[in-house]
């Protein structure tokens, strides 16, 4: 298998596969990702169509979201994110990690809405009362036996951006602890036989986010194939 990565935008459209295109992507792994959707749920139909199009052409498709999907519009906020989870189930998402806005409605709400999720939730650097709050990673095994190792990282800035009452007991590994966490995930997934290591991260990009930005992490941690 070879690996392709795609980013989805609102303009995404998908064409029906023809006899000529069916099977043309056999042997390809396609990773589609969204992030910072912020309740723009109208785009999920396009996401689902694009995933189906790639699959119809023979590709193995992994559809992921890198956080901030349960907040931002009335369409999702009125249900405290439950509507977003329902539509992401229908769109065929495989894995997500968490953004800071996932904590707008509190940890208990996350547990409630994710209980109905048909996709995995990975976040290796989030602790609840000192213990892992979510699964750290997921091994995805493809039809030919190829293994993809995916781990999640949430921004440590959530600790200062979220309402303290909503994240009581929740801590986020940051700086050197964040790097060590990522290194441990790479090691564990490599030892599990994963051919590709994918970090699904919701980390800052601005200067004020240093040293917890994606570029800071990638400068310190080796072995990540896709971020």
Residues covered by each model-derived region:
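Sec-dependent N-terminal signal peptides of Gram-positive bacterial secreted proteins and lipoproteins
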Residues: 1-10
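Acidic, metal/ion-coordinating pockets
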Residues: 10-227
């Amino acid at each position: 298998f070879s690996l392709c990565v795609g980013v989805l935008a609102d303009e995404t459209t998908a064409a029906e596969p023809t006899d000529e295109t069916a099977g043309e992507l056999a042997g390809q792994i396609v990773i589609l990702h969204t992030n910072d959707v912020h309740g723009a749920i109208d785009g999920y139909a396009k996401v689902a169509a694009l995933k189906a199009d790639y699959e119809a052409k023979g590709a193995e498709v992994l559809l992921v979201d890198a956080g901030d999907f349960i907040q931002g519009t009335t369409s999702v906020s009125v249900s405290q994110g439950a509507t977003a989870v329902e539509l992401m189930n229908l769109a065929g998402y495989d894995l997500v990690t968490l953004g800071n806005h996932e904590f707008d409605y509190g940890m208990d709400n996350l547990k409630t809405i994710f209980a109905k999720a048909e996709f995995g939730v990975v976040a290796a650097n989030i602790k609840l009362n000192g213990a892992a709050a979510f699964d750290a990673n997921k091994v995805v095994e493809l039809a030919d036996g190829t293994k993809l190792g995916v781990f999640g990282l949430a921004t440590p800035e959530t600790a200062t951006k979220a309402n303290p009452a909503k994240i009581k007991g929740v801590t986020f590994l940051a700086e050197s602890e964040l790097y060590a966490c990522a290194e441990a995930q790479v090691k564990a997934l490599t030892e599990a036989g994963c051919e590709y290591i994918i970090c699904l991260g919701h980390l800052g990009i601005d200067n004020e986010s240093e040293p917890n930005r994606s570029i800071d992490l990638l400068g310190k941690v080796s072995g990540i194939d896709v971020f």
